[in-house]
Amino acid sequence: VNSRCRRAAPALALGLAALLFPQQASASPTAAPDPVVFVHGWNSSGSTWDTMAGRFRAAGWPDDRLHQWTYPSGQSNATTAAALAAEVDRVLAATGAARVDLVAHSMGSLSSRYYLRNLGGTAKVDAWVSLAGPNHGTDAARLCGGPACTEMRPGSAFLQALNTGDETPGATRYATWASPCDVFVRPASTVALAGAENRTTACLGHTDLHRDAAVHADVAAHIG
């Protein structure tokens, strides 16, 4: 009898360990990242994000977490912000996620900021990124017409309202990237926001920021 007990003891000990410490019996699953909604700029489309989205995929981000949204860029940024609100709700419903990250290029920074500030976006957005965003205006917008371009001009009523008070409201984590060689959004200081992490890239053109590998790495670290 004693020999049988001795033989059964190791199995009994293993069974007790599994009951007492179940978390050690299986590895914890890796949480899926927040979905990313990419917001392009003026006279562009969602395809402008192909390079950056491809880098996210190569790093293991699932396709259903990457949304290259397209909208009519000539309309008012307030109109675009309302459409963005609907897109964010669609993505959250489709993925079951609690919040998204917004990654914006150029004028896309303005509609996404309007959404955060005025349409309840801070409750649904964990991290926000502005790449070469004319957050305080750019004189290059005087060379184009229509509501969107008018709103991008320094001193516009749209920008004055957007930048009055807290430029980075809510618990959303804000970050901006500006290039010293951007000839469309200048000076580079127009990109920075009070309360955000404001960074300067290498000498990149306006349409190169969202295609640059180093910028992608920084963006991934910020939203990750």
Go through the PLM ranges and name each one.
Residues 151, 159, 167-224:
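C-terminal catalytic-base region of ester-bond hydrolases, centering on the histidine
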Residues 2-27:
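Secretory targeting and sorting signals
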Residues 45-51:
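The serine-hydrolase catalytic nucleophile loop
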Residues 28-34:
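Cleaved targeting-peptide boundary
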Residues 52-61:
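A short, Lys/Arg-enriched amphipathic alpha-helix followed by its capping loop at the start of a domain
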Residues 34-40, 60-63, 69, 74-168, ...:
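Serine-dependent carboxylesterase/thioesterase catalytic core
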